[in-house]
UniProtKB/Swiss-Prot annotation:
One Gene Ontology cellular component annotation held by this UniProt entry: membrane
Organism classification: Eukaryota, Fungi, Dikarya, Ascomycota, Saccharomycotina
Localization terms from the record: Membrane
Name used for this protein in its record: Putative uncharacterized protein YPL182C
Additional note from the record: Partially overlaps CTI6.
Main location: membrane
Provenance organism: Saccharomyces cerevisiae (strain ATCC 204508 / S288c)
Sequence intervals crossing the membrane: 47-67, 84-104
Region span, Disordered: 1-34
Length: 127
């Protein structure tokens, strides 16, 4: 009776050993996919950097239509995974720049408004 139980116990670890070996082969494709995605993202980051740099030049020149250059992102190819990742990374990088641009524009308008208010007060005092 003891011999069949020990043989049954020894057969179950063999089955368990087969299962981890089959599961160890399945993590290999995700690691390959991860490395290929990493390669795609490393390829798209320079594209995003160039587009963002062009937009920063537009913003630094205080172009009032610099916000409309966001629509130029739609001209990028979005059919493949490269285009999708490029648009996503450009959106992530472009949104803070647009918000900063709006804040600078609002602050500049506020500063000019205060300047006009000070000029009008100075002109009003001598009268």
């Amino acid at each position: 009776m003891k011999n069949p139980e020990s043989s049954g116990v020894s057969s179950s670890p063999q089955i368990q050993r087969v299962s981890p070996s089959s599961s160890s082969t399945s993590p290999s494709p995700p690691s390959i996919g991860t490395s290929s995605c990493f390669t795609l993202s490393s390829c798209t980051l320079p594209i995003a950097a160039v587009v963002v740099a062009v937009d920063v030049v537009d913003i630094m020149s205080v172009d009032p239509l610099a916000m409309t250059s966001a629509f130029s992102i739609s001209s990028l190819p979005t059919t493949g995974p490269l285009g999708t990742i490029a648009v996503d990374s450009i959106t992530l990088l472009y949104t803070p720049i647009c918000l900063c641009y709006l804040l600078v524009r609002l602050r500049k308008v506020n500063f000019e408004g205060n300047k006009l208010l000070m000029v009008s007060v100075v002109n009003f005092v001598p009268l």
